[in-house]
Amino acid sequence: MNVEELPLLRQSERAAFKRCAWAWYMEYVRRIRPKVELGKEAADFGSLFHIALAEYYIPGLERGPHPADTWDKLSSDVVAAVKTTDYTNDETVAKWEDFHDLGLDLAEAYVELYRGDPHWLVLDAERRFDVIIPDVRYKPMVSEKGKRGYRPIVRVVGTFDLCVRDLNDNQVKMVDHKTAKDIITYHLTLDEQASTYIAVGTTALRHQGLIEPTERIVGMEYNFVRRGRIDDRPTDEDGQRLNKDGSVSKKQGSPNFLRYFVPRTSKERQRQVVRISEEARVMDDVRTGRMPLLKTPQRDCYFCKFFDLCELDESGGDTEYFISTTMQSIDPYADHREGAISSKKLHDA
């Protein structure tokens, strides 16, 4: 099989497949999505904040436009758009007007807290990658000249948020921006996104000449931004929030910002490559009908974009008519097609 004929695979797609193969099939094989998605404002908030940070962390030690300025422009455009759309919804308009102000406050506080991260030498931001993963069922082939070759199974594509050289220890690290309603870290040691990006990232960065052939990415720095109001109460020398009378408040609240580093060893990176290869094989078996297409019913199904379609499918209804009237065709790999312009940067490189 030629490289161009290999199936593409995104990290988010891996998670989607293991969450529910049927929903994965709808989005990544049928390539459909609802024409109108309710409740996706939080995800859009995160996407815009990512762009604001991508414009800020430009290669080198200098920094780009203030994230608040980029956020103001992008979110103002969204507010104007939701006010004029054919699907005008007062609740959506109000939410984005609130998000506009919230994002400005968070961007200002972010820069005030981290001061531009002078210890981060930015190697690249929002860099797309395309890495071939070998089929681990087959042993490497060795040519007469001693070169090792592999039988490919899938092309893993994606986008790194940020890659930096930490001048405090001269180590190369990935940085992943996370906007969320709550900051949760207990699962991150097993997070596959870190493992995947680091596993393929070292190879990608070496090929791009951004790191030396002997260097590797040592881990992922999760850069959390909690989507909540800034607590502007005064603090004591220990950083605890104070009441108006100067006493320490019993309600300290949750931090808006947190950095959490997860290291990855060479064995962990190698194991992730094996896992990607194994999952790609199972996906192909489902895609081609060699394995049954299964669903994973659970209480979170209500929040799935395909919930209504799934209910109709379970009841034996006319799903094809429903798809033709409520769904739109998409390309989940659009960002990674040849010549594509990145949707995650204002100015594509």
Q: Model-flagged regions — what are they?
A:
Residues I51-S143:
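A non-catalytic, helix-rich entry segment at domain boundaries
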Residues L48, V157-T159, I217:
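Extracellular structured ligand-interaction cores
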Residues R33-V36, D176-I183, A349:
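Glycine- and acidic
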Residues R30, A54-L61, V111, R115, ...:
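Hydrophobic/aromatic-lined pockets within catalytic cores
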Residues D124-R206:
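Non-catalytic protein-protein interaction segments used by genome-maintenance enzymes to assemble
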Residues A21-V29, C163-D176, R275-R281:
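Active-site-adjacent bridging/hinge elements
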